[in-house]
Amino acid sequence: MTGSPPRRISVLIPAHNEADYITGCLTALYASAISGHGIEVLVLANGCTDDTVARARCVPVPDGWELRVLERAEGGKLAALTEGDKAANGDILIYLDADVQVEPELLSQIAHALCPDRALYASGSPCVTPAQSAFTRAYASAWVRLPFVRTGAPGFGIFAMTRAGRERWGQWPAIISDDTYARLHFSPEERIRLPGRYHWPMVEGFSNL
């Protein structure tokens, strides 16, 4: 996509023991078809006891990108996000789960859609990764037919906003659904669904859903 003025983009990836996923997440992210923007990636490692951090640092960083790894001894996604927001330099903030893989077009579409002088929210078009268990497959089949998944900008797995949008609240509260909390700070007219796809794995098993 062309015609977008240069932007500063921060991609915040909270990660707690995500060694099995972080390499795939970053590899897909770095393959984004985007140029002409300053992009920093902040891996927000919180309470990790595996080699998430080492694996994140091993993925080759493309020219024009910057990787920063912020390590917290304590676990907790929301506290990590608050710390990441303070460290981020972007005028576009993208919040990406460590087990999600974006397709190449999505970041460029986000940069084009989010006008810097407005409070706006955007997300891509989700593709739920095929589940392993029969129960999760059935749940996923119903989930993807929900109206907010099919036609809205749901934001689970990845969501983005302008700085003006992020200024609508302070620290992230101690809640479960950060994407829902963020989305509800924007009116339907301020939420943008983009055609760029991303792949999101649903948690497995009845007890985790």
Where are the regions that the model predicts?
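Short aromatic/hydrophobic "clamp" motif used to bind/position activated sugar donors
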Residues: 93
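Short, well-formed alpha-helical segments that are part of the catalytic scaffolds
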Residues: 18-32, 55
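Glycine-rich, basic loop-to-helix element that forms the pyrophosphate-binding segment
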Residues: 71-88
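Short beta-strand/loop segment that forms part of the nucleotide-sugar
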Residues: 37-48, 68-70
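Conserved donor NDP-sugar-binding/catalytic core segment of glycosyltransferases
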Residues: 104-134
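The conserved acidic donor/metal-binding loop of glycosyltransferases
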Residues: 97-101
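Cell-envelope/extracellular polymer assembly enzymes that use nucleotide-activated donors
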Residues: 8-10, 40, 181
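A conserved acidic beta->alpha catalytic loop
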Residues: 28, 45-54, 74
